[in-house]
Amino acid sequence: NWLEEMHRKSEQTKKKIEKHLLDAPQVSTDGTVVTENGHQSYIRNFSILDWVLYESMGSKGHKALSSIPFLQQYAGILVHDHETSLYSYGLDHAECNVHLLRYLVKNGEDTRHIWSSKLHSLLVEMNEYRKRLIGRGEKSLPDKTLQRLEARYDELLEYAKQERKDKPSGFRWATKEETSLLNRLKKYKRNHLLFLHDFNVPFDNNMSERDLRKCKNRQKMSGGFRTEAGKEIYCSLLTITETCKRQGKDLINAFKTILSGASLFA
């Protein structure tokens, strides 16, 4: 059928999209669960402002990631929500701070510790300050300001240690989750604060999350995919349609071009 034909003939167009992504200094990525023949599988996207690529995956782990050509070649910054498997790819990594803000709110509610709200406020303050500088045409933070903000971050982690000693949580599960969160904040401090060092790096991974909504909505409304081939066709078509929208291209003409055997984009 024409969908299978589109999938086959879109290979060159997808390679051009991938090339633009490979040339980008930072790329946002996320994955979502879909069902395939009744079993759990995934769709992952790679997004920048004008280009987006969707990939079908059997699982979310390292083995599946290693089969994605884009990840094998990419040498820039990957922006994601603490997917530790992704740290084997790319040149550097930026953590999504919107997700972190949610975890901090939850931790404060679960443990009643106030360090969470203090760090939440600090991260929001950092982001707002950066936005003001960008609005004034600045390219980076003043060194002294950067040092002050990072020192405040470190102080709050020390404050958290003392607060936990003085006011231990009454719930073992909450204590365990808080320990994991604090370990993450310490180990991945640089990745969470990379947006302060490089103004091209986003504060969050919202772009990639938005680009996955169609996949999530399809799963809710239509259910999963019957076959792996069907999921791959869907990813190809979504790659073409979503990129065409970003580029302001007419979809009908774009489909005609691909079905004629030609490719889109330079």
What are these regions (language model features)?
Residues 1-266:
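Catalytic center-proximal scaffold of phosphoryl-transfer enzymes
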